[in-house]
Regions:
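Positively charged n-region of N-terminal signal peptides that target proteins for export
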Residues: 1-5
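Residue-level marker of positions within ordered structural domains that often coincide
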Residues: 6-7, 135
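Hydrophobic h-region of N-terminal signal peptides that target proteins for export
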Residues: 10-18
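A beta-strand edge to alpha-helix "cap/lid" segment located at domain peripheries
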Residues: 21-153
Length: 153
């Protein structure tokens, strides 16, 4: 039984040898992913659902800080909501954790604006899961949560 298990592990590892890894040039890919995160922020600032449409697949899942879960269509519709007017969205302490054809991007965000004419200011953290397929990066899942003002940011 141990021999069969060891063989299966060896077979799996050897199957990965020929798989190209887009993160071989880690610095370039990390820079690209951070640029995509910044493009995402700009799309949100300008209610640009077309810009985000190419960054997220049809299977996209978003979990908002209040626990709301949205699919791609819901997320893009929410993005166009004219009652939400962000005046600033900034990421800080962004880190990219590369894996085979996948990268996890985490960081802090600070956003200001108005929602239904009431001012807001949020400090939070985000986790985005990106996959590399069809020669491009797409974010398949995103999660945000709020942190208290003054918490480690």
């Amino acid at each position: 039984m141990k021999t069969t298990g060891a063989f299966c592990v060896l077979l799996f590892i050897s199957s990965l040898v020929g798989v190209p890894n887009p993160l071989d040039d880690s610095t370039a890919d990390q820079t690209k992913l951070i640029a995509l995160e910044n493009a995402w922020n700009q799309a949100q600032l300008h209610h640009d659902d077309r810009a985000l449409d190419g960054l997220i697949p049809d299977t996209f899942v978003y979990t908002d800080y209040d626990g709301t879960v949205m699919n791609k269509a819901q997320f893009l519709a929410d993005l166009k909501d004219p009652s939400y007017r962000a005046t600033m969205i900034a990421n800080q302490n962004v880190k990219v954790y590369p894996y085979q054809n996948v990268a996890i991007v985490v960081g802090n965000y600070h956003t200001k604006g108005t929602y239904k004419r009431k001012p807001f200011e949020h400090f939070g953290r985000f986790t985005d899961t990106w996959i590399y397929r069809d020669s491009k990066w797409q974010c398949v899942a995103s999660h945000t949560n709020l942190i208290k003002k003054g918490a480690e940011f």
